[in-house]
């Protein structure tokens, strides 16, 4: 059965609840942080008292809800343990910082004073056994964005593989101390089951989809020159929004676009926009590779790095491919307003928030028929799902969209918007999370064993030592 048929709205009503305590290592502005913030705000809107504990939250580099008083964010354990040692040992430092935070807020009585109803933890599972030891009557929901052992890079090195062995083991073992594990898609649930078959037998795994903000109005005041260029109607726009990383397979969009006969590409632009950091070697290298690929297909291309009116107005009229590096939100809004089709090229994407943003903006989506998009996009209804190995199939969809009557596109856009609003809004996410919490709260918790493995005892000693050093 197709996973997309399993997505159903969740009903519920706001009601007073107890305290829910979140633990997240670093509240920056990434996708995991956006999910945590949305989950916390959503539960708060359902009547829960919510507190987030974190090792780090820079007011200048976090989401508004974390600094404007919407959420109660408490920072502990930021020192003396660093985030890394000479840009290495990152996972070890993260675990030690997390354990230090746990012990510190327990010794100070801060955590007990909250009388937590449940813990929600994500990214780092190593502290779960300690939580069960210190608070045996408080259930834990662990949100697994994706198995860390599958994300860790550099495993080609024998030394790196050896270094990762204990952390890979700790990841699986410690997740067994949660009462339930939540994941971001049916696809990720399948990956978790295959990666840790033993965990599946011990812990229930639930799907809690990430969300997009369906309530805020787009601010067009800062769009300015971007609207003049992209939403002017001078070109039909095929849009891709993704980080400039090889795993995103942006080249697929270029190849499919190049396969459209030249006569049908007249008056059409392929816009490749997304995250880019000149300090990241892969971003720089992949952008150069994509430029070379465009040139090899005789496609005129132009790169934009500044988005003021002057820079945008200087885009050559004969450029059929545009590379937009590190676009601001106002430009992203203009691009979605102008796009006839959003092309989402990654294969086996864990979830994929960009297709939801496009559908909310009433833009049909063409995506790979693997991973999370299979669950969010309804094929031939809100977009198309195609084999990422079949360039011609992608090119054919592009050609069909370019020739499709505007009324048909508008209907697909309306269907996409309705799907996102009914299934992937923040309230729906909060209700799914709330249902998961209610389920684990209804179960009688088994007391943890009296003695944990030596590794946990050592970790506690290290954390206590770190707290002692901090208090000196």
Language-model features, listed with the residues they occupy:
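N-terminal strand-loop element at the rim of the active site
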Residues: 5-17, 24-29, 42-94
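Active-site proximal beta-strand in glycosyltransferases
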Residues: 118-120, 133-154, 160, 206
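A short, well-ordered alpha-helix in the C-terminal region of glycosyltransferases
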Residues: 407-423, 435
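Aromatic "clamp/platform" in nucleotide-sugar-dependent glycosyltransferases that forms part
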Residues: 347
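Conserved donor-binding/catalytic core segment of Leloir-type glycosyltransferases
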Residues: 21, 226-248, 254-258, 270-277
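Membrane-proximal helix-turn-helix segments that form the acceptor-binding/catalytic region
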Residues: 148, 160-181
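Nucleotide-activated donor-binding/catalytic signature segment of Leloir-type glycosyltransferases, i.e.
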Residues: 274, 278, 283-330
């Amino acid at each position: 059965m197709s996973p997309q048929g399993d997505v159903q709205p969740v009903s519920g009503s706001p009601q007073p609840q107890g305290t829910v305590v979140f633990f997240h290592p670093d509240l920056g502005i990434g996708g995991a942080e956006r999910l945590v913030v949305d989950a916390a705000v959503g539960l708060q809107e359902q009547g829960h008292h919510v507190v987030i504990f974190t090792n780090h939250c820079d007011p200048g580099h976090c989401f508004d809800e974390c600094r404007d008083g919407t959420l109660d964010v408490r920072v502990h354990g930021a020192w003396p343990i660093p985030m890394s040692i000479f840009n290495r040992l990152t996972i070890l430092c993260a675990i030690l910082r997390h354990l230090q935070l746990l012990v510190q807020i327990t010794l100070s009585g801060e955590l007990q004073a909250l009388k937590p109803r449940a813990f929600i933890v994500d990214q780092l599972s190593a502290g779960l056994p300690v939580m069960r030891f210190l608070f045996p009557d408080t259930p834990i929901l662990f949100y697994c964005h994706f198995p860390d052992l599958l994300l860790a890079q550099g495993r080609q090195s024998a030394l790196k593989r050896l270094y990762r062995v204990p952390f890979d083991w700790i990841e699986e073992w410690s997740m067994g101390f949660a009462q339930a594990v939540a994941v971001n898609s049916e696809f990720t649930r399948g990956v978790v089951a295959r990666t840790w078959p033993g965990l599946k037998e011990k812990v229930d795994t639930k799907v809690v989809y990430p969300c997009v903000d369906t309530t805020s109005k787009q601010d067009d005041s800062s769009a300015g020159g971007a609207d003049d260029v992209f939403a002017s109607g001078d070109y039909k726009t095929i849009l891709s929004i993704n980080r400039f990383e090889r795993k995103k397979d942006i080249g697929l969009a270029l190849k499919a676009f190049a396969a459209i006969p030249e006569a049908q590409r007249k008056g059409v632009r392929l816009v490749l926009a997304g995250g880019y950091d000149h300090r990241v070697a892969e971003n720089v290298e992949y952008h150069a590779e994509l430029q070379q690929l465009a040139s090899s297909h005789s496609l005129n291309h132009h790169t934009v790095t500044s988005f003021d009116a002057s820079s945008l107005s200087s885009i050559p009229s004969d450029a059929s491919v545009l590379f937009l590096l590190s676009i601001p939100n106002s430009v992203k809004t203009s691009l979605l307003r102008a796009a006839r089709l959003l092309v989402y090229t990654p294969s086996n994407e864990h979830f994929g928030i960009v297709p939801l943003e496009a559908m909310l903006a009433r833009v049909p989506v063409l995506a790979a028929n693997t991973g999370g998009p299979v669950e969010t996009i309804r094929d031939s209804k809100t977009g198309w799902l195609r084999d990422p190995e079949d360039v011609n199939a992608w090119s054919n969809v592009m050609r069909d969209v370019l020739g499709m009557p505007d009324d048909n596109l508008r209907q697909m856009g309306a269907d996409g918007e309705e799907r996102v609003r009914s299934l992937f809004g923040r309230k729906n996410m909060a209700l799914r999370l709330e249902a998961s919490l209610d389920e684990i709260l209804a179960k009688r918790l088994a007391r943890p064993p009296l003695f944990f493995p030596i590794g946990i005892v050592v970790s506690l000693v290290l954390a206590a030592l770190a707290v002692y050093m901090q208090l000196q």
